[in-house]
């Protein structure tokens, strides 16, 4: 019987949970603010982890840039805390990446909503 998840997938889920807790409770850098870990991708040998994050202030480019700099500066500390929290032989090297999928999804949703409204207006005007 085949496994449902690869080990790297299970480790990625656990890393996502642990880093979310670490960012919320341990990291005190004011540049980071309200950050959400949206996804984690771990290499098959578990030596590298890409951590995709979003910020509460997604509309402010400067704040996002500062938040990413804060995360990069705190990454060695976060990695050490991750090593203490998880029982892994090798703690993956972590890299933070800003996840634009949420922003893009909202933009696409707004575009679709606007097109539907315009289409409804046309149909109302044509029926009058």
Swiss-Prot record:
Q: Which domain of life is it from?
A: Bacteria
MF terms from GO for this chain are: ribosomal small subunit binding
Fetch the Pfam families from UniProt: RBFA
Kindly state which keywords UniProt assigns to this record, in alphabetical order: Cytoplasm, Ribosome biogenesis
One of its GO biological process terms is: ribosome biogenesis
- Where is this gene product found? Cytoplasm
Q: Where is the signal peptide?
A: none
Presence of the UniProt keyword DNA damage in the record: no
GO CC, sorted alphabetically, is:
cytosol
Q: Which PROSITE patterns match?
A: RBFA
Q: Which family does it belong to?
A: Belongs to the RbfA family.
Question: What function does this protein fulfil?
Answer: One of several proteins that assist in the late maturation steps of the functional core of the 30S ribosomal subunit. Associates with free 30S ribosomal subunits (but not with 30S subunits that are part of 70S ribosomes or polysomes). Required for efficient processing of 16S rRNA. May interact with the 5'-terminal helix region of 16S rRNA.
Oligomeric form and interacting partners: Monomer. Binds 30S ribosomal subunits, but not 50S ribosomal subunits or 70S ribosomes.
Put simply, this protein is called: Ribosome-binding factor A
């Amino acid at each position: 019987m085949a496994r449902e998840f690869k080990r790297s997938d299970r480790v990625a889920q656990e890393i996502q949970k642990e880093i979310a807790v670490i960012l919320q409770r341990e990291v005190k850098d004011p540049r980071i603010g309200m950050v959400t870990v949206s996804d984690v991708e771990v290499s098959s040998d578990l030596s590298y982890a890409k951590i995709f994050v979003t910020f509460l202030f997604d509309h402010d480019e400067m704040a996002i840039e500062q938040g990413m700099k804060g995360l990069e500066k705190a990454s060695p500390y976060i990695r050490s805390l991750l090593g203490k929290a998880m029982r892994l032989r090798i703690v993956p090297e972590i890299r933070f990446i800003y996840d634009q999928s949420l922003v893009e999804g909202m933009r696409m949703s707004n575009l679709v909503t606007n097109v539907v409204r315009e289409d409804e207006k046309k149909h109302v005007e044509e029926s009058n």
